[in-house]
């Protein structure tokens, strides 16, 4: 049986991809890591890890059900943050202000329905609405702290969340390749 590495989520708008590129250029060579390619910037609602074809079919059924029960909504991107914390930053991300509760509820619904089908990722964490822009390898602490302080309250734009998708992730030496397996429009 074929296994695929996958997540449930959606791709962000071009404007957010451009913000990520601008931040990358601003801190060039002071924060080193794997920056997310503009075409790959996305919001993950649930990382599934390796799933079988049979599990993928169940996830698709769940997304179809969820899409019928939810209508499109807007989110606003605001501020930068890091995971797990500023003392050991591994991930640099753009946060969500307006619409964060709706995103959280959507992510919980995805996780709940998938769990009912026995699809429970190994590394399940509490959902924090964010868009990863860099996986940090090394950094200048002063630069990182200044960046976080500078952008703490900055609004970066907005998106309409109007669809959710099962997306496969193929890891390659040049970075992941994301492929939409199936997507559903909210309210459809």
UniProtKB/Swiss-Prot annotation:
Stored Gene3D superfamilies: Cyclic phosphodiesterase (3.90.1140.10)
Single annotated GO MF: RNA 2',3'-cyclic 3'-phosphodiesterase activity
SUPFAM superfamilies: LigT-like
GO CC annotation terms, alphabetical: cytosol
Hydrolase recorded as keyword: yes
Motif HXTX 2: positions: 130-133
Domain of life: Bacteria
Motif (HXTX 1): 42-45
Catalysed reaction equations from the record: a 3'-end 2',3'-cyclophospho-ribonucleotide-RNA + H2O = a 3'-end 2'-phospho-ribonucleotide-RNA + H(+)
Task of the protein: Hydrolyzes RNA 2',3'-cyclic phosphodiester to an RNA 2'-phosphomonoester.
Family: Belongs to the 2H phosphoesterase superfamily. ThpR family.
The protein's name: RNA 2',3'-cyclic phosphodiesterase
Taxonomy of the source species: Bacteria, Pseudomonadati, Aquificota, Aquificia, Aquificales
């Amino acid at each position: 049986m074929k296994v695929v590495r996958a997540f449930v989520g959606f791709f962000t708008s071009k404007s957010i991809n451009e913000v990520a590129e601008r931040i990358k250029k601003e801190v060039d060579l002071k924060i080193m890591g794997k920056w997310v390619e503009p075409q790959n910037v996305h919001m993950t609602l649930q990382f599934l890890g390796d799933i079988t074809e049979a599990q993928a079919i169940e996830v698709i059924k769940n997304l179809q059900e969820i899409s019928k029960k939810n209508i499109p909504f807007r989110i606003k991107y605001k501020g930068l943050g890091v995971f797990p914390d500023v003392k050991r930053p591994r991930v640099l991300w753009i946060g969500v202000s307006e619409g964060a509760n709706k995103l959280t509820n959507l992510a919980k619904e995805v996780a709940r329905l998938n769990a009912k089908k026995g699809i429970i990722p190994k590394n399940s964490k509490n959902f924090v609405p964010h868009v990863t822009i860099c996986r940090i390898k090394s950094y200048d602490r002063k630069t990182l702290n200044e960046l976080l302080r500078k952008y703490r309250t900055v609004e970066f734009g907005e998106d309409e969340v109007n669809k959710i998708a099962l997306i496969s992730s193929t890891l390659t030496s040049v970075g992941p390749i994301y492929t939409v397996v199936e997507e559903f429009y909210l309210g459809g």
